[in-house]
Amino acid sequence: MARRPILLGDQLVLEEDSDETYVPSEQEILDFARVIGIDPIKEPELMWLAREGIEAPLPKGWKPCQNITGDLYYFNFDTGQSIWDHPCDEHYRKLVIQERERWSAPGAIKKKDKKKKKEKKNKKDKETSKSPLVLGSPLALVQAPLWGLAPLRGLGDAPPSALRGSQSVSLGSSADSGHLGEPTLPPQGLKAAACAKGLLASVHEGKNALSLLTLGEETNEEDEEESDNQSVRSSSELLKNLHLDLGALGGNFEYEESPRTSQPDKKDVSLDSDADRPPTPGKLFSQGADSSVASANGSKSQGRGASPWNPQKENENSDPKASSSQMAPELDPGGDQPSRASKKQQAEDPVQAGKEGECRRESAAKEPKEASALENTSDVSEESEIHGHLKDARHSGSEASGPKSFLGLDLGFRSRISEHLLDGDTLSPVLGGGHWEAQGLDQEEQDDSKSSIAEPQSKHTQGSEREHLQSSLHSQATEEGPLQTLEGQPEWKEAEGPGKDSVASPAPLSLLQREQVLSPPASPERAEEKHSQAEELGLEQPEAEETEEKVAVCPSSPVSPEVQTAEPAAPQKLFSEAILKGMELEEDQRLLLEFQKEKPQQLEERLWEEEEEEVCQLYQQKEKSLSLLKAQLQKATAEEKEKEEETKIREEESRRLVCLRAQVQSRTEAFENQIRTEQQAALQRLREEAETLQKAERASLEQKSRRALEQLREQLEAEERSAQAALRAEKEAEKEAALLQLREQLEGERKEAVAGLEKKHSAELEQLCSSLEAKHQEVISSLQKKIEGAQQKEEAQLQESLGWAEQRAHQKVHQVTEYEQELSSLLRDKRQEVEREHERKMDKMKEEHWQEMADARERYEAEERKQRADLLGHLTGELERLRRAHERELESMRQEQDQQLEDLRRRHRDHERKLQDLEVELSSRTKDVKARLAQLNVQEENIRKEKQLLLDAQRQAALEREEATATHQHLEEAKKEHTHLLETKQQLRRTIDDLRVRRVELESQVDLLQAQSQRLQKHLSSLEAEVQRKQDVLKEMAAEMNASPHPEPGLHIEDLRKSLDTNKNQEVSSSLSLSKEEIDLSMESVRQFLSAEGVAVRNAKEFLVRQTRSMRRRQTALKAAQQHWRHELASAQEVDEDLPGTEVLGNMRKNLNEETRHLDEMKSAMRKGHDLLKKKEEKLIQLESSLQEEVSDEDTLKGSSIKKVTFDLSDMDDLSSESLESSPVLHITPTPTSADPNKIHYLSSSLQRISSELNGVLNVLGSLNSQPPPQGLGSQPPPPLFTSSLRSSKNVLDPAYSSQAKLSSLSSITPMSTQWAWDPGQGTKLTSSSSSQTVDDFLLEKWRKYFPSGIPLLSGSPPPPENKLGYVSVSEQLHFLQRSHPRVPRTDGVSIQSLIDSNRKWLEHFRNDPKVQLFSSAPKATTTSNLSNLLQLGLDENNRLNVFHY
């Protein structure tokens, strides 16, 4: 079943492969019948549905698929629906229900009523007929006139008979679809003439077309909208070029259908042995090889919107060679072939038709199916048109209009057997069913006329018979009024068709008369049929008379073997009576023709107007729905375009920002240059103004000095005159001395006045220059501030616009997703509604179809093979003529195209000529531009020369300014002297102010020192009380140590006594030193905790920075993937066909949404991590500040005395118990720190809580970062996270520990914490440090001396916890520390010797352990003599331990 499988994800998509040789077994048919609800035993009449459904192919869009478990299911790639059962099963279940209901409905009552109504009208026919004919009775040999073919003409000139002929052909194509499972019909006499072969061919085609009628309609429903425009163009344009005018082929081609379709037939087992089941696919192909002729005829009515789509149209367009090959064996241009040749052809036709059917089926499976132009309109308007056409049909009195209109509909179903003809749209109105019947009748009449009757006589009898029959039928029609249609013939909407369908093509009256003679007297329906035939003949008689060519119709063999044996015994009397009656009917026929010429034209116009209005309405509705869908799609595409435009806008904004920055920078540079030029100009103006001011002031000073000198001279001269006059009498010596003194005094005063004036003038000039410079600096600073503010504002606005654009883009993305969901739901609802409407119409059409086919299912099977050869002969002739016409049209089109090509070339030459003119004009313009550029260069050179002249003038002005400055140097010297005096005065004032401020500060310091001394006194009293308490503890411990077995102390306390203090004071001093050491150790541990937490915070910051970078990379990758997905989605929407890549696009979209969700979670987690880090830093700062306050308070209490302790050191192997027993002297309960323990505990707990929350956040970040990104999105794995260590001060402050145990625990804690903080899982590497830095460093140095191979760790401590992210939370570290720090028992419970032995064993084990190499870089003891020296410990002024060598 499957070939060329396609793998989509984990699903395997298979392809359906039809096997022509496959024949289902009876067991398979029975099983499938039970599946669709048929009981094979009780309902054998419904088994044909099971045989048909088991071979039904998959509808379009459905494909079989196989999942990973091997189960098969069916998936619709158009709607996305998936089911387990075959898609056709449910459809055939509904058909079974409809057939069952139709069988249960009563159907015989209507037939009886119709027979009663028609008994009175057909009494004359009963009298004329001598004996009723039964099945197998002999047939009369009568002649029929020959009719010719009308010339070819366009679609606009087609008479009503052309459309009528096309509809009559469709009866054969749909006549025998329901021939199985129908109730038994009453017996009926055979007609006078043989049934047409063409009708039989169309009957078998109807079987093939209707065997899968519902399946074809259901599967191709969605293809109809896509192929509307193509079918409209192909059918309408080609039909205008080529079609057959069947009105001239004989109007009697249809009238014989009416009695055969209106009278119910009895099922004949001898004629149809397969009546209980439908033919197998082989039979369908063999019987329906020529069905393309019938199905192609529906295109004319489709062009008018009268029927649904034609299932044969696409295939006729696709393969003209196959159609010509199918028609070749059926053509028989020879008109006088014997009946044996037709019998021989009957045997050959099934084989040849079977082969042709296989070819057609293969080509139909490969070629795409195209729907006709008016499928959508005909489905909607079908119900509204049925009743209107049927009313017109009743007025015309045509009982046979039901099946003929049914043919025009062509049922709207698409057959699975695709027939191919040469451009089938051009052959749409080929031969009608009535034409086939006429050919068969004419053939028999020609055989009879060879012996007795001449051809002109037959024409004469034909005319008289036609007139007589029409007059009688017209009188019957006026009496009867509107007639009812027979049961089994559904009231189709297309029953009468457009006006052309309500009338039939003209038929020869001789055939009507023969039909009247040969009809049995017991049939009550013959009168109605003849009446309808007469109307059809009368309406189309003018069309037949216009034809000038007479073409001989090929004779055909009799209907069946029974008919052949019965022909020689037929009486000749019947024919003579028919001739007499025909002569009587000629006058009546003329009146009937005149009456009926006007009636069909009015009816036709009215019907066409109604149909056009309905078609326009439906077309408008369709256009509206399509426009709505297009608008929605355009909105979606517009939103996607807006997204792309937003991205483009962002890029443009970034470019614009860069351009703005460059512009701002260039503007600032230009502005600075401008400011510089303005400053230079302003300075130049100031200098010039200062020079003018100096000149003016100098002139004024000189004038003032001259005036003062003149005044002084005048005063002196007056005084001298008065003095001379007064002292003239006195001594001349005194006068001269006094004059000398006065002159000297006046000269000094004059000099002082001149100096004072000059100093005052210089000060004023200096103030003026400084004020101008200050104003200039203020102007420059204000301008710079404005420039910076403008730049900041522009950058802020650009940032705001970028943020707004990003926010709008996110909103648009959300809106697009919601819109896509709404659009998909809307389309799904619309598709379901259309499917329901279509199923409802299909069910109604099927019911009517089955009723119509019940009467005509077993009539034309035997006659089909005989008529096929004759019809194919005529068809080949027509095809040749069509080909010639087509070639002529192609030649004319080719000439027109050559002419158009020549015109295009001529226009192209004109364009080239114009372009050359434009090039010449362009070259002239370029020359003008070059000339203008040369002029501009000359002008630029002139401007450059003028600039040079200006520069020379500026240089000259600068030289003049320098000369002016040289003249003012002596004035500046005088200014300097004046300023020096002023500065000395200001310095004295500043010194006085500084002394006052210093005095205030000293007073405040005195107050602070007094308060501090009070606080220190209080603290000293508390320390004395603590010392007293610890002395008591020391006494108790000394008593216990005296009771121990090894009394030799290793610690010489006598060496500490430098004064004559008592033992009590010595113990107090030692306890004080130990308590301070413990306090230092606790403080140092807290400091180490703070440093470790600081390292952890830095590591956390680095980790967050790395996570931010990785998140940005993932965001960029996500944006690129989204753009790629949008591009793929747009390209997939542009393609009309359904692609399998839509599922991949859907998966990609899900992955993109999941990636955006992960990135949002990472953003929130990183934001929370930043907040926690800030809180942790604040807590650490608070803890550090509290510790600093504590240390500052303790430093004030430290003394300057140095306390020393000596140790008698020996080799490590010779450590005696006596030296170790002195250690309990150092085992003193430490004093708690002076810091507030509640505050420290609160800060520690808050730090622990923050660290635990930070641990959770970082774990979330690591898990998010470790998730694999979707297609195309890559992110690096999270880097190893930071680690943190927590060393609580309470571990150091625990009382009752021995000094050795404390030292060992401290030494084990310190490397463990450093190991966690820096290098997890690889051991600790501590660098050596100076022993004078901290207490911890000193202790580490001592432990290196005692343990050269490294500091011993706790033997039972587990390894540090490992984390896949590298991060260790504070709670886990505390838990690990609690587990790794075993409580060392007190010395009063365990002996010192056992402790020494255990330590030795541990040291040996630690040395031999190759895995632990902790302090490989620690210095080892070089010689044992250094250890034997005396060492002394002492405290310096900073309260630090130092080692003194002796």
UniProtKB/Swiss-Prot annotation:
Function: Plays a role in microtubule organization and/or maintenance for the formation of primary cilia (PC), a microtubule-based structure that protrudes from the surface of epithelial cells. Plays a critical role in G2/M checkpoint and nuclear divisions. A key player in the DNA damage-activated ATR/ATM signaling cascade since it is required for the proper phosphorylation of H2AX, RPA, CHEK2 and CHEK1. Plays a critical role in chromosome segregation, acting as a mediator required for the maintenance of genomic stability through modulation of MDC1, RPA and CHEK1.
Name of the protein in its database record: Centrosomal protein of 164 kDa
GO biological process: cell division; cilium assembly; DNA repair
Basic and acidic residues biased stretches: 257-277, 355-372, 384-397, 490-499, 525-534
Interaction with ATRIP: annotated segments: 1-195
Positions with biased composition (Basic residues): 109-121
Signal peptide limits: none
Domain WW intervals: 56-89
Biased composition (Acidic residues): 218-228
Organism: Mus musculus
Cellular component GO terms, alphabetical: 9+2 motile cilium; apical part of cell; centriole; ciliary transition fiber; cilium; cytoplasm; glial cell projection; nucleus
Classification via SMART domains: WW
Region described as Disordered: 106-132, 159-185, 217-238, 250-408, 424-570, 830-849, 1261-1287
Gene3D superfamilies from the UniProt entry: Photosystem I PsaD, reaction center subunit II
Subcellular location per the Swiss-Prot or TrEMBL entry: Cytoplasm, Cytoskeleton, Microtubule organizing center, Centrosome, Centriole; Nucleus
Quaternary structure note: Interacts (via N-terminus) with ATRIP. Interacts with ATM, ATR and MDC1. Interacts with XPA (via N-terminus) upon UV irradiation. Interacts with CEP83, CCDC92, TTBK2, DVL3, NPHP3 and weakly with NPHP4. Interacts with DZIP1.
Transmembrane segment boundaries: none
Annotated Polar residues bias: 164-176, 288-312, 451-461
Biased composition (Pro residues): 1267-1281
Keywords linked to the UniProt accession: Cell cycle, Cell division, Cilium biogenesis/degradation, Coiled coil, Cytoplasm, Cytoskeleton, DNA damage, DNA repair, Mitosis, Nucleus, Phosphoprotein
Gene behind the chain: Cep164
Phylogenetic classification of the source organism: Eukaryota, Metazoa, Chordata, Craniata, Vertebrata
Coiled-coil ranges per UniProt: 1143-1197
